[in-house]
């Protein structure tokens, strides 16, 4: 505990919280251009081919973003919207592509949790 005299001399320092998504620069989403679209494998207990894209953002950062859902139409030079949110079993992947905006189409034939995958209400 500091004494009152020590507090008079210099005030308490604020603890600075480190952001988990620095490339967004305090914005909810950021636009970017895909420089590479590829698949990668997850960490140890899991096994799959996860779809990811390397994206150059308008903030100047180049980040790796996960493409959620079954099937996608994203290719090199596609313009996509990126939001925060990491993928626990992919090291270094801290962002998600927002489906159903810009060049990223929504997931086809999706019935449940449609808003998360940019899918319109099915006729019927």
UniProtKB/Swiss-Prot annotation:
<keyword id="KW-0689">Ribosomal protein</keyword>
<dbReference type="GO" id="GO:0009507">
    <property type="term" value="C:chloroplast"/>
</dbReference>
<keyword id="KW-0934">Plastid</keyword>
<dbReference type="InterPro" id="IPR005679">
    <property type="entry name" value="Ribosomal_uS12_bac"/>
</dbReference>
<feature type="compositionally biased region" description="Basic residues">
    <location>
        <begin position="11"/>
        <end position="20"/>
    </location>
</feature>
<dbReference type="InterPro" id="IPR006032">
    <property type="entry name" value="Ribosomal_uS12"/>
</dbReference>
<feature type="region of interest" description="Disordered">
    <location>
        <begin position="104"/>
        <end position="124"/>
    </location>
</feature>
<dbReference type="InterPro" id="IPR012340">
    <property type="entry name" value="NA-bd_OB-fold"/>
</dbReference>
<keyword id="KW-0150">Chloroplast</keyword>
<keyword id="KW-0699">rRNA-binding</keyword>
<protein>
    <recommendedName>
        <fullName>Small ribosomal subunit protein uS12c</fullName>
    </recommendedName>
</protein>
<dbReference type="GO" id="GO:0015935">
    <property type="term" value="C:small ribosomal subunit"/>
</dbReference>
<feature type="region of interest" description="Disordered">
    <location>
        <begin position="1"/>
        <end position="28"/>
    </location>
</feature>
<comment type="similarity">
    <text>Belongs to the universal ribosomal protein uS12 family.</text>
</comment>
<comment type="subunit">
    <text>Part of the 30S ribosomal subunit.</text>
</comment>
<keyword id="KW-0694">RNA-binding</keyword>
<dbReference type="GO" id="GO:0003735">
    <property type="term" value="F:structural constituent of ribosome"/>
</dbReference>
<dbReference type="Pfam" id="PF00164">
    <property type="entry name" value="Ribosom_S12_S23"/>
</dbReference>
<feature type="compositionally biased region" description="Basic residues">
    <location>
        <begin position="109"/>
        <end position="124"/>
    </location>
</feature>
<keyword id="KW-0687">Ribonucleoprotein</keyword>
<dbReference type="GO" id="GO:0006412">
    <property type="term" value="P:translation"/>
</dbReference>
<comment type="function">
    <text>With S4 and S5 plays an important role in translational accuracy. Located at the interface of the 30S and 50S subunits.</text>
</comment>
<dbReference type="GO" id="GO:0019843">
    <property type="term" value="F:rRNA binding"/>
</dbReference>
